[in-house]
Amino acid sequence: MAKELKVQSPPQALKAGHLPAVKAGGMRVSKKQGNEENTAPEKNAKKTLQEKPSSVLNMTKMQAMNILAGELEKLSHDFPGEAAQIAHKKPRPTVEKIILPKRLYIIQQPRRC
């Protein structure tokens, strides 16, 4: 049997609770903690959990819309749309305003020479 050698990276000291920054191209770049493999399944799991309730919500919304549509049809027979338009129009005045002509004030001023 062959012995397997386990390669371990040297332990890095944490500074202020996170890994130290690495210099790349003259600028400091911080390293991200954690494995990228672990984060991908969590995102997928969240999406699947969100899809299931949304389909149930869509069905309840559709049922509510059907109920509302039926009620709106009943209301349209009882209260026609023309009556609603008349109710929202601006009322006409019974007596028209008489607009008096403005007075012209002539101010006499000396002429310019």
UniProtKB/Swiss-Prot annotation:
Organism, scientific name: Xenopus tropicalis
Pfam families for the chain: DAP
Similarity field: Belongs to the DAP-DAPL1 family.
TM segment ranges: none
GO biological process terms, semicolon-separated: regulation of translation
Function text: Ribosome-binding protein that promotes ribosome hibernation, a process during which ribosomes are stabilized in an inactive state and preserved from proteasomal degradation. Acts via its association with eiF5a (eif5a and eif5a2) at the polypeptide exit tunnel of the ribosome, preventing mRNA translation. Plays a key role in ribosome hibernation in the mature egg by preventing mRNA translation, leading to ribosome inactivation. Ribosomes, which are produced in large quantities during oogenesis, are stored and translationally repressed in the egg and early embryo.
Gene giving rise to this polypeptide: dapl1
Alphabetically ordered keywords of this record: Translation regulation
Protein name listed in UniProt: Death-associated protein-like 1
Entry superkingdom: Eukaryota
The UniProt record lists the keyword DNA damage: no
Location of region: Disordered: 1-55
Subunit structure, interactors included: Associates with ribosomes; preventing translation. Interacts with eiF5a (eif5a and eif5a2); preventing translation.
